Swiss-Prot record:
Residues 33-55, 199-266 are annotated as: Disordered. One of the primary rRNA binding proteins. Required for association of the 30S and 50S subunits to form the 70S ribosome, for tRNA binding and peptide bond formation. It has been suggested to have peptidyltransferase activity; this is somewhat controversial. Makes several contacts with the 16S rRNA in the 70S ribosome. One of its GO terms (biological process) is cytoplasmic translation. Residues 209-219 have a biased composition (Basic residues). SMART domains: Ribosomal_L2, Ribosomal_L2_C. InterPro entries: NA-bd_OB-fold (IPR012340), Rib_uL2_dom2 (IPR014722), Ribosomal_uL2 (IPR002171), Ribosomal_uL2_bac/org-type (IPR005880), Ribosomal_uL2_C (IPR022669), Ribosomal_uL2_CS (IPR022671), Ribosomal_uL2_dom3 (IPR014726), Ribosomal_uL2_RNA-bd_dom (IPR022666). Belongs to the universal ribosomal protein uL2 family. One of its GO terms (molecular function) is transferase activity. Keywords: Ribonucleoprotein, Ribosomal protein, RNA-binding, rRNA-binding. It comes from Ruegeria sp. (strain TM1040). This is Large ribosomal subunit protein uL2. GO terms for cellular component: large ribosomal subunit. Part of the 50S ribosomal subunit. Forms a bridge to the 30S subunit in the 70S ribosome.
Length: 280
């Protein structure tokens, strides 16, 4: 979908660039496929902030999206494409031949009336899901499982995709948009195509209030805090911090690797996403 830019009739309109969602469904979601969603405000079960800069925002209903695509060999027709406030991608309402309805992630170039199917070996059309064992090499895919039957976890955000580049001893090699090359089991499901709404990253919300509507609060720099609140805090006048950039808890930030190298999935990463960086 295209981007909409606005004339600066007010300060909040100046620089505003939003996604044109005029072609999406304008009604409410299917009630049987929605749940209530309680806001956490970034707090955990003890009431402490574990994820900063969250809180407020408009109320949402959670749409139950089918990431597993495990209803095999039953064709489904796309009824409509909908907006989902809980993710950057759009979602598609599909109706199976047996009458069941489900929400799936809408890939690019999926239109109302299209047929989609999940099968052991399906046509290479956007929205069709199949395991890597039945897929030709070179296919662009999204919503990729990391464990068979667990549901898609990789390449679910707007505009993302991965490329199936090879097979190796029961594993499929996929190249992610970050540049990472990794292995997943051939039994893992993936959906053909790239995720919808590729222009999402080109939006400019124009004013802080629009981010507050999305539930995002201001990000305060450590250098303007007091010493009790941040390692960069304190000092008379403006100071540069006096040490390498760290988080509020003293851990190095801005590029420091934090991934645990003892993770079980570490051996499935053939080429790190950092390998392309100079001097690394």
């Amino acid at each position: 979908m295209a981007l909409k830019s606005y004339k600066p009739t007010t300060p909040g309109q100046r620089g505003l660039v939003l996604i044109d969602r005029s072609e999406l469904w304008k009604g409410r979601p299917v009630k049987s496929l929605t749940e209530g969603l309680t806001k956490s405000g970034g707090r955990n079960n003890t009431g402490r902030i574990t994820s900063r800069r969250r809180g407020g925002g408009a109320k949402r209903l959670y749409r139950i999206v089918d990431f597993k695509r495990n209803k095999f060999d039953v064709a489904a027709t796309v009824e409509r494409i909908e907006y989902d406030p809980n993710r950057t991608a759009f979602i598609a309402l599909v109706k199976y031949e047996d009458g069941e309805q489900a929400y799936i992630l809408a890939p690019q170039r999926l239109a109302v009336g299209d047929k989609v199917i999940a099968s052991a070996k399906a046509d290479i059309k956007p929205g069709n899901a199949m395991p890597f064992s039945g897929m030709p090499i070179g296919t662009i895919v999204h919503n990729i499982e990391m464990k068979p039957g667990k549901g898609g976890q990789i390449a679910r955000a707007a505009g993302t995709y991965a490329q199936f580049v090879g097979r190796d001893g029961g594993y499929a090699q996929i190249r992610l948009s970050s540049g990472e090359l990794r292995l997943v089991r051939q039994e893992c499901m993936a959906t053909v195509g790239a995720v919808s709404n590729p222009d999402n990253s080109n939006q400019n919300y124009g004013k802080a209030g629009r981010m507050r509507h999305k539930g995002k609060r201001p990000s305060v720099r450590g250098v303007v805090m007091n010493p009790i609140d941040h390692p960069h805090g304190g000092g008379e006048g403006r100071t540069s911090g006096g040490r390498h950039p760290v988080t509020p808890w003293g851990k190095p930030t801005k590029g420091k690797r934090t991934r645990n190298t003892n993770k079980a999935s570490q051996k499935l990463i053939i080429r790190s996403r950092h390998a392309k960086k100079k001097g690394r």
